[in-house]
């Protein structure tokens, strides 16, 4: 899936920003969170997040739900490299496995399970 953030910011600029963030906040992970293009779920107001390394995927999903004001009965799915990461996984381990060459972790979210795959821990 194409990232609007990648389209809007050149690679060198993204890489420099991620490196600066990692140096300044070594216990945090630079995350770009974007909606899957054709999803009918609300669009998030902020794409860039500085996430504590010890946050779980489930806790991050909670943050996203709050930001898009998603009601409890509505589903949300987040994807890393088009795969659903385990809810209990730490963001730091997801980052180490899936970070982009620019240093950011790219996460997409949708109101439906658009890709269908699950990652097993």
UniProtKB/Swiss-Prot annotation:
InterPro entries: Atg8-like, Ubiquitin-like_domsf
Pfam families, per the entry: ATG8 (PF02991)
Keywords: Autophagy, Cytoplasmic vesicle, Lipoprotein, Membrane, Protein transport, Transport, Vacuole
Location(s), subcellular: Cytoplasmic vesicle, Cvt vesicle membrane; Cytoplasmic vesicle, Autophagosome membrane; Vacuole membrane
Keyword Protein transport carried by entry: yes
GO cellular component: autophagosome membrane; Cvt vesicle membrane
Predominant location category: membrane
Residues the record marks as site: Cleavage: 116-117
Any one GO BP annotation for this protein: protein transport
Keyword Coiled coil tagged: no
PANTHER family: MICROTUBULE-ASSOCIATED PROTEINS 1A/1B LIGHT CHAIN 3-RELATED (PTHR10969)
Purpose: Ubiquitin-like modifier involved in cytoplasm to vacuole transport (Cvt) vesicles and autophagosome formation. With ATG4, mediates the delivery of the vesicles and autophagosomes to the vacuole via the microtubule cytoskeleton. Required for selective autophagic degradation of the nucleus (nucleophagy) as well as for mitophagy which contributes to regulate mitochondrial quantity and quality by eliminating the mitochondria to a basal level to fulfill cellular energy requirements and preventing excess ROS production.
Designated name of the protein: Autophagy-related protein 8
Upper taxonomic lineage: Eukaryota, Fungi, Dikarya, Ascomycota, Pezizomycotina
């Amino acid at each position: 899936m194409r990232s609007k953030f990648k389209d809007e910011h050149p690679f060198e600029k993204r890489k420099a920003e991620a490196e600066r963030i990692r140096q300044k906040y070594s216990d945090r992970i630079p995350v770009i969170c974007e909606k899957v293009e054709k999803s009918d779920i609300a669009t998030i107001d902020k794409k860039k997040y500085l996430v504590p390394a010890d946050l779980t995927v489930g806790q991050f999903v909670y943050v996203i739900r709050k930001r898009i004001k998603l009601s409890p009965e509505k589903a949300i799915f987040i994807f890393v490299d088009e795969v659903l990461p385990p809810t209990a996984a730490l963001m730091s381990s997801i980052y180490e496995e899936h970070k982009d060459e620019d240093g950011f972790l790219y996460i997409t979210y949708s109101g439906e399970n658009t890709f269908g795959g699950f990652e097993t821990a």
